Amino acid sequence: MSFSVDVLANIAIELQRGIGHQDRFQRLITTLRQVLECDASALLRYDSRQFIPLAIDGLAKDVLGRRFALEGHPRLEAIARAGDVVRFPADSELPDPYDGLIPGQESLKVHACVGLPLFAGQNLIGALTLDGMQPDQFDVFSDEELRLIAALAAGALSNALLIEQLESQNMLPGDAAPFEAVKQTQMIGLSPGMTQLKKEIEIVAASDLNVLISGETGTGKELVAKAIHEASPRAVNPLVYLNCAALPESVAESELFGHVKGAFTGAISNRSGKFEMADNGTLFLDEIGELSLALQAKLLRVLQYGDIQRVGDDRSLRVDVRVLAATNRDLREEVLAGRFRADLFHRLSVFPLSVPPLRERGDDVILLAGYFCEQCRLRLGLSRVVLSAGARNLLQHYNFPGNVRELEHAIHRAVVLARATRSGDEVILEAQHFAFPEVTLPPPEAAAVPVVKQNLREATEAFQRETIRQALAQNHHNWAACARMLETDVANLHRLAKRLGLKD
């Protein structure tokens, strides 16, 4: 088989039709899966010796949340090291990263696999992976044809990453530095709430404004602070963390501002506080609502004038610190109750951010579950950790009062339990491995009982005829793709279609 000009043009057109990078990536992957008639395709971004899925087709949704470290995935490492098309034989001893992650084929190993490394100049920026259940599925495509596909994908990904770099550095194209992947804290989620939060982080990161991050316990407020710092001009300097809730009143002032030798009993030497440590960088004050009113007043002075006094010292020190604060309280209510200073609240909340709870993030729970499954796989040295359909359904309908932190602990516990019930290094998480209280799953919809007007043979043929019609429509009348969807041999499908009057 060879690609026609029309096929390549169609791929290029789909890339241009997309609205935004994510849509273009998804169109590319979906089109490639149809053109190459494969069971699964994925576009991956390369960053810090790991591949990060950007778009998938034919794979379980939790794949989008997984982070594939090269050390744990020899096939992906081989793709990263190669400068050209990589074909893995059906009998390859290297495990496929997608084994168990193709819906409907969880118990089968992937047979055919092709990897296409993507480059921008000499820099590896990503990869395309193509997988099929038939051992010779990609033999009909030459390396040259696959290189054309890789070139189109590399161009799309390179442009997207360059635009991302320009936006993050607030540069005009004429000032662009040589292509370099932008380091980012990975905030996993594609829900509207998380998409909006990521946009707001991009906006505020480039400024020097103080930020108040609010959200329930376990939603990931510290991750938001890290993302702001890493995308800011202060990223080359430290991000210093202080949990205000864990500060004893007796040492709180010293922790924040430092002390000099002899300032109090036990002060045997000079000590820098968190503000000094964060000079020219960022200070993250977690659980800011737990600070006493006395400390709030001293913190306000630092924000107003930019100077601090160590405990026991009469001299002032100038510091240049950006403050990011987080709380799980409603600070407006705390102000009204007299437990939080109104002037400090207004100083901190120049640019407020709200982190949505997990129960409002829809399918993000599955992406996050995939991320934690992959973490457990690496930590425990397992070959694979996958979610069953029942486990995914359970996760999507649980309320998660503890948010992302509760999900993380639940996945880790489930992996340990599942591992104990079966031998080998493969773990499949079932619903019974999760100990969630009072989870009410939606009942299956009751199907209406049809009035029988046909004999069994006629009813069976009518059902087969309609099923094939729907499969053909979904696969653009591609008989090979239709056969794979229906899990039957393509020759048998042709014979059945002729008998049913669907083919001449």
UniProtKB/Swiss-Prot annotation:
Residues 479-498 bind DNA. Residues 187-416 form the Sigma-54 factor interaction domain. One of its GO terms (molecular function) is ATP hydrolysis activity. It holds the Pfam family GAF. The modification 4-aspartylphosphate is found at D57. InterPro entries: AAA+_ATPase, GAF, GAF-like_dom_sf, Homeodomain-like_sf, NorR, P-loop_NTPase, Sigma_54_int, Sigma_54_int_dom_ATP-bd_1. SMART domains: AAA, GAF. CDD domains: AAA. Pathway: Nitrogen metabolism; nitric oxide reduction. Keywords: ATP-binding, DNA-binding, Nucleotide-binding, Phosphoprotein, Transcription, Transcription regulation. GO terms for biological process: phosphorelay signal transduction system. The keyword Transport does not apply. PROSITE patterns: SIGMA54_INTERACT_1, SIGMA54_INTERACT_2, SIGMA54_INTERACT_3, SIGMA54_INTERACT_4. ATP binds at residues 215-222, 278-287. PANTHER family: ANAEROBIC NITRIC OXIDE REDUCTASE TRANSCRIPTION REGULATOR NORR, TRANSCRIPTIONAL REGULATORY PROTEIN. Required for the expression of anaerobic nitric oxide (NO) reductase, acts as a transcriptional activator for at least the norVW operon. Activation also requires sigma-54. This is Anaerobic nitric oxide reductase transcription regulator NorR. It comes from Escherichia coli O6:K15:H31 (strain 536 / UPEC).
